[in-house]
Curated annotation (Swiss-Prot):
GO MF terms held by the record: double-stranded DNA binding
Record organism: Actinobacillus pleuropneumoniae serotype 5b (strain L20)
Transmembrane residue ranges: none
Xref: InterPro entries: RdgC
Protein name as it appears in the record: Recombination-associated protein RdgC
Name of the encoding gene: rdgC
Length: 302
């Protein structure tokens, strides 16, 4: 099961509804296929469930998709060295300097020669659509990776009007108050890790294994620094780092959560996948609702 390790949340700006059969037909049009000998990269949809030919997994209005990207790894220095050697040989043979277009053609030939022997890097990115709440969750540690997968989904569906979720209150201000004023929600435990920034001077303080209620941290906050990253623990649910843009990184679900479905036989892969997905999505739904409450509600963008 694709237990999310990072969470980037997007809000649909106009209603989206999907039907399993029609969605599957659309996904098949942009299905992942491996790189051929002449391809540098390929990007498409793979099955979330091992052994299944379906390119999505659904539970009522919940849909899980997985994008699959393959990149051929060609070290730039290898290409450069081989290209320069070929250019030097040809220039000496013809007693002239090659044109820019001729050099590019040689480089293209070098790449074509090396591609069949290149190693591949594979990257899988899970995306969960909660159409009950009209929210989209992407398991990505960077905006680019998330946007690439959203762009693939947009291409697949024809349109996908989404924006990053935002709130009435700035998460950085709320997190700062949690520490500075002791307003930490009773469902939340602060861990000993944070990042503080001064927006006037661009100075950054990163703390690890640090008591966040210490005098040292208080002095930083009094010096107009804001909390931009905060390691938190939602007891018996999961721990993570909450960022100023309301994204979550280093998400680690508690053993109590991950072991809830251990009574399902390992051989029942589909049943266990279904149960784990329901478990994970319910946890993230609950946490999202708590964030919405703490940050003053979702801010509608025009």
């Amino acid at each position: 099961m694709f237990w999310f390790k990072n969470v980037m949340i997007y809000r649909l700006t106009s209603p989206l509804s999907l039907e399993s059969h029609s969605l599957e037909d659309q996904l098949q049009q942009t299905k992942f296929t491996p790189c051929s000998q002449s391809d540098m990269s390929k990007f498409g949809w793979s099955s979330p469930l091992s052994g299944s030919e379906l390119l999505h997994f659904s539970q009522s209005k919940q849909f899980l998709l997985v994008s699959h990207k393959e990149d051929k790894l060609l070290p730039a220095n290898v290409i450069k060295k081989e290209t320069e050697e070929r250019i030097a040989v040809l220039e000496e043979k013809e007693a002239r300097k090659l044109k820019k277009t001729e050099k590019q053609a040689i480089k293209d030939d070098v790449v074509a020669m090396l591609l069949p022997r290149a190693f591949s890097k594979h990257q899988f990115t899970a995306i969960w659509l909660d159409l009950d709440a009209q929210l989209v969750y992407v398991d990505a540690g960077s905006s680019k990776r998330a946007e690439d997968t959203l762009a693939l989904l947009r291409k697949t569906l024809g349109s996908l009007p989404v924006v990053p979720i935002s709130f009435a209150l700035l998460p950085s201000e709320v997190m700062t108050n949690w520490i500075a004023k002791g307003h930490t929600p009773n469902w939340l435990n602060l861990l000993e890790e944070a990042e503080l920034k001064s927006f006037d001077t661009d100075s950054v303080v990163r703390c690890k294994r640090q008591d966040l209620e210490s005098e040292e941290i208080a002095q930083h906050l009094q010096a107009s620094k804001f909390v931009t990253k905060l390691a938190i623990d939602w007891e018996n649910h999961f721990s993570c780092v909450l960022n100023e843009d309301a994204t979550l990184s280093r998400v680690k679900f508690a053993d109590e959560v991950r072991e809830k479905n251990d009574d399902i036989l390992k051989e029942d892969i589909a049943q266990r996948f279904d149960a784990d997905l329901l478990l994970m999505t319910e946890e993230l739904k609950l946490f999202t609702q708590k964030m919405i409450e703490e940050f003053g509600g979702i801010k509608e963008r025009i």
